Every structure is written in C-alpha cells, then in structure tokens.
Amino acid sequence: MAFKKSTNWIGGFLGMKLLIDCDYIVYKCCASTETEMDFGEDVIVVTSDFSEAYKSVQRELNKVKKEFGDFSEIILFFTSPNNFRKKIFPEYKGHRNRKKPCGFKRVINKLKEDYKVIVRDGLEADDTMGIYQTKYEGNVIVSPDKDMRQIAGKLYDFKETVDITPDAGARWHLIQTLSGDNTDGYSGVPGVGVKKAEKIFSEKGYTWKAVVETFIDKGLTEEDALCNARLARILTVNDYDSKKKEPILWTPSANYRVDSGTEAEAQTDGASTK
C-alpha cells in the first residue's frame, strides 16, 4: 500500500511538534553501549557506560531535529509497563521476553528531567502518539513502526516523510487486521500477508464484511476478527476515554467500510471514530 511522500518541507514544518517514538531510540542506543566482561568459569557480566548511552540518545534526537530544522519542538513518548492489549489477548507480545539493555530505565529517567516526556498508563507509545496527533493536528510522528501508518497526518520513519490521509490510515488498519503482526504476537488470518490482504480488499472493498468473510473462510470466527482488529488498532483521540483514563475498544458497525474521499465510519461503544 503506497503512501504519498510529503513535499511540504522545512518551512512547512515551522511550529510543528515532533512526536518521537523514543522506546526505539533508547533501546538501540543502550544496546549499542553494552560491554560484555568474561571473568571465566561461570561469570559473565554485561555493563554499560551510562554517559555514553545518554549522549548517543541525544545525538539521535538532534539528528531528527536537524531533519526538520532546529526550530522544531520535540516530545518523547514511551510505553507504559502495563498494556491494555494483554487484557484482550494475554499472549500479546508474550514472546518478547528479552530483558531491556543496561541503562534503559536510567536513561529514560534522565530524559524525563531534560525533555518533555509523555507516558500514559496502560498504553504503548504508539497509542499515546496516535491520541496526541489526532487531538492536536498538524504535528509529525517520528517512528519506524509500520503501525503508525494508521494515523492521519505526517509520519517520518527515519528515511522519508509521508502524508497519510484518514482513508489511507483506516485501510492500513484493516490490512493489518488480516495480515497480523508476528512481532506483536497476533496472527491475523493464516496465509494472508500484506500483499494478499490488499488483493482481497481490492476485490471486495475495504469493509468489515470482507474482513469477517476472510476469517470465516479460514475456519475462524467473527470474534477472532474483532480480537485481531482491536489488537491492531492504534488508538486515536476518539478511542480513548480521558475521564476514565482507559481505551474505548474499537467496535465496527456491520456495514463499516472505508471509501475513498470519505471518512471511515465505526461505532465504538457509542462513540464515532471519525
């Protein structure tokens, strides 16, 4: 699925905030500064140079700022230790049992002192960025995660900046529902990848009916389809109850569809996700 490359460069970004997925940056920088010390016998110790790890993170953040001009304000987003998706599907990201690299938490704590940082309990950084971007439009999401293609607006993936329309974002959500995400631990429809999902939707239209039919054709159920759709969904401002401080689980109407030139319509516990 193609997304339009942004041509609104430098001057057009004046006054925008850069919403940065900092989980990725901190993990990468801390891992790169780890050192293994072998004392022989059964003792091997992994150490890290905190100062170098922190400087590495700052260098990465400065690179991003320079990409858009130093006038850009940055906000760093991190994932909460709790995750609402585990209540939907306990095995969600269950295979990610590798410990964080040395210094990971300490670097984050230092960043909280030096930068504006946002973490929402129960949410991943992706969700918090999605909520912020759809509440305060006109900013740039900075993330290599393909999930962020669901969120309308500008997305910089560390290679290029693309403009994502509401329709394109809604279509990508349905594609991910069918194709699943092995990295996150939900399978979608067996044997259906992104290319095949696009082919199915090109023939049947981007509808909830097409999603359900594809799941049923493989011996699965509509409940399976809804579970995958909720796991795949990156939250927007309309998917979050700010008073209760909890997600509003995505619930499509039977005739949900995404039409070019119109907004997708869904019913989410009585709230429209337009």
Residue map of PLM features:
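Domain-level signal for Mg2+-assisted phosphodiester chemistry and nucleotide/NA-binding surfaces
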Residues: W9-N109
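Extended two-metal-dependent nuclease catalytic cores across DNA- and RNA-processing enzymes
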Residues: W9-F13, V43-V45, F71, G94-A266, ...
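Positively charged N-terminal leader segments that act as targeting/secretion signals
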Residues: K5-T7
